[in-house]
Amino acid sequence: MSFFRCIGRFALFMLDPEHAHRLAIVGLKSGLNSYRKVVDRRLCLTVAGLEFENFVGLAAGFDKNAEVVEAIFHLGFGFTEIGTVTPKPQVGNPKPRLFRLREDEAIINRMGFNNNGHHIVYSRLCACKKLGIVGINIGANKDTVDKIDDYATGIACFYDIADYFTVNISSPNTPGLRDLQARDSLHLLMNALSQARREQKKKHGFSVPIFLKIAPDLSEKELDDVAEEMKLSDFDGLIVSNTTLSRQGLRDSKLSGEKGGLSGCPLFERSTIVLAKMRQKLGKEIAIIGVGGIKDAQTALEKIKAGADLIQLYSGIVYEGPDLAITILKEILQFMQQDGVDTIKTYRDHRVEYWAKRALPL
């Protein structure tokens, strides 16, 4: 058992979750973590035209405001995602808004896109030393009437420094945001953002990949609609998935009634089923990043086998500690050695059918 699981987690869990998160950011900014990474050509891959040193990324939500971009790569991650960032700064929803469900190794959040806004985050990113792939997760302000315009503004603002964009229309904590996943709205959104990218490509001379991040609570018909719009668009990939509104199977009855999106271990099955279904619907060429419930090498590898090209995690480091990316990569290399596999890409899609045939959880 790691030092974090023995002592560090106990100490941090004595604190309010937001306070603990702030302390983690301060620690990383102070350089308390040593520089470590796992370098092995078998972990390298190219996705959406981008070259990744490894397939394990830190999901949006941890470093919302680009405060510790360099330090995240010191933890072994192959890429990181900043945000969600909105055009104007906003404080988010009232506190308390972040809850640990320890029995379930889960988190409920209703943060509400609290962030410093485009201008400040852009300035911080410009000052960073680039150590790997950095994506920008863009969103809309809570009080915005034209939410699509907020996303287009995000693409224009960060275009010259983003390695990729994530269009976050699946957070359950901004009123009306998930409505953008409905087919007619999604069609308008994707067309507008494709046009925004074309304008920026003409200006800058290069194209930045765009990923769409979806909820795990969509019906089979809604997944079909997303797949069809993805095929019609020039978006580069999908991120599956955001947090869930479901509370199915939770043991922590005290906190399970809190409003917000649920992440962590209980999300693994639901998000992996959706991932595999979307891989079947989209075919082999469109990139997919798998997120939800990854806590070790086994769950990371299962996402790849279910159809993911890359994975992201966040809740996992809350419960397993900051060494999680390094641990996953080392153990994956052991699996590859045992299986005689030369590249992580070999595992992709091995269990798509197994996961895709399962019914979507209620």
Curated annotation (Swiss-Prot):
Cofactor(s) needed, names only, are: FMN
Q: Which InterPro entries match?
A: Aldolase_TIM, DHO_dehydrogenase, Dihydroorotate_DH_2, Dihydroorotate_DH_cat, Dihydroorotate_DH_CS
Query: What pathway is this protein said to act in by its record?
Result: Pyrimidine metabolism; UMP biosynthesis via de novo pathway; orotate from (S)-dihydroorotate (quinone route): step 1/1
Q: How is the cofactor bound?
A: Binds 1 FMN per subunit.
Q: Which GO BP terms, alphabetically? A: 'de novo' pyrimidine nucleobase biosynthetic process; 'de novo' UMP biosynthetic process
Q: Which of this chain's residues are annotated to bind FMN?
A: A60, G61, F62, D63, K64, T84, N137, N168, K213, S241, G264, G293, Y314, S315
As recorded in UniProt, its EC number(s) are: 1.3.5.2
Keyword Flavoprotein in annotation: yes
According to its UniProt entry, the function of this protein is described as: Catalyzes the conversion of dihydroorotate to orotate with quinone as electron acceptor.
The protein in question is named: Dihydroorotate dehydrogenase (quinone)
